[in-house]
């Protein structure tokens, strides 16, 4: 399946579920779609082959998710070795990966998957406490149940302590034996993100100037390499998607438009700082010269500058 068609399918599933969706068209970007609802915020990377996601893209995707208390997700149709199975969760760099059919079942049908793929096959996590209660209720010793399931006593005890995943084959035997569901669903919409938010490391002299000024204003700055913006600048509840360019180009304008689209979905403002530029607004994202940023005294003044420029452009429309 072509990637563009796949992105369109995923976007339609998201919209059908009632989420607001923005598309980001950036070569090599860490996410392609951002979707939000009342209790849901997703940053999604869409690829045909989930093994083509790079470690750098994954780290940026996880940073965004952690900063916005969102869920990162990869949607694809195959790995380098096989098709992605419906109803099965895969994982790449600590991010859940699934196919569009599974995403549909989660968002539209409210059905959370329980099966995940790892080297060696398909597995589930089970409720170990429930397994122990069922074993005791049916009068099985550890050895007897282990023998019935075809596993070692040690493995069975690990299952009961929630210390070991269970192969799908063994889990099905358990559920058939006890006539009760034991597998724990995987809440792919509430995934925990494990990533370190390192201090921003500038790649250009202009980035260094901008980052230093933002830090001087009391903002935390997190560098994001594979997104329409260069960094996330944050102070308390204020977050600014911050773009940096030497001068205004077609690429700058397109990036600003994408920042505006993303900002509308996640309720966050944007700002582009250029080496030299007149003050203007592109799709409600202000473009300002670095000299104007240097004159700012605090975060409140920066926000007022951004909002003031947006008000001016609205009046002129």
Swiss-Prot record:
GO terms for molecular function: DNA binding; DNA-binding transcription factor activity. It holds the Pfam family HTH_3. Keywords: DNA-binding, Transcription, Transcription regulation. It comes from the Archaea. The keyword GTP-binding does not apply. The keyword Transcription applies. Residues 131-189 form the HTH cro/C1-type domain. Residues 142-161 bind DNA. This is Putative HTH-type transcriptional regulatory protein TGAM_1316. It comes from Thermococcus gammatolerans (strain DSM 15229 / JCM 11827 / EJ3). The lineage of its organism: Archaea, Methanobacteriati, Methanobacteriota, Thermococci, Thermococcales.
């Amino acid at each position: 399946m072509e990637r563009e068609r796949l992105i369109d399918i995923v976007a339609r599933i998201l919209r059908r579920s009632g989420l607001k969706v923005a598309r980001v068209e950036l070569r090599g970007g860490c996410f392609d779609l951002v979707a939000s609802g009342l209790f849901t915020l997703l940053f999604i990377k869409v690829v045909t082959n989930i093994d083509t996601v790079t470690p750098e893209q994954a780290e940026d995707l996880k940073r965004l998710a952690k900063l916005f208390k969102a869920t990162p997700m990869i949607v694809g149709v195959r790995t380098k070795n096989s098709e992605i199975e419906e109803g099965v969760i895969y994982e790449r760099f600590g991010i859940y990966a699934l196919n569009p059919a599974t995403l549909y079942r989660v968002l539209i049908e409210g059905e959370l998957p329980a099966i995940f793929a790892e080297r060696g096959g398909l597995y589930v996590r089970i409720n170990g406490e429930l397994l122990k209660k069922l074993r005791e209720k049916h009068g099985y010793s550890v050895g007897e149940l282990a023998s019935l399931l075809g596993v070692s006593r040690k493995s069975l005890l690990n299952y009961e302590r929630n210390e070991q995943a269970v192969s799908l084959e063994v889990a099905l035997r358990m559920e058939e034996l006890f006539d009760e569901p034991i597998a724990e669903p995987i809440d792919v919409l509430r995934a925990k993100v494990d990533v370190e938010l390192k201090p921003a490391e500038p790649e250009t002299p202009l980035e260094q100037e901008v980052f230093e000024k933002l830090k001087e204003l009391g903002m935390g700055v997190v560098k994001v390499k594979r997104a329409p913006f260069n960094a996330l600048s944050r102070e308390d509840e204020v977050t600014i998607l911050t773009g940096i360019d030497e001068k205004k180009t077609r690429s700058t304008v397109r990036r600003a438009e994408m920042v505006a689209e993303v900002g509308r979905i996640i309720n966050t403002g944007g700002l582009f700082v250029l080496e030299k530029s007149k003050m203007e607004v592109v799709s409600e994202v202000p473009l300002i010269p670095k000299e104007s940023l240097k004159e700012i005294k605090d975060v409140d003044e920066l926000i007022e500058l951004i909002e003031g420029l947006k008000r001016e452009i609205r009046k002129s429309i």
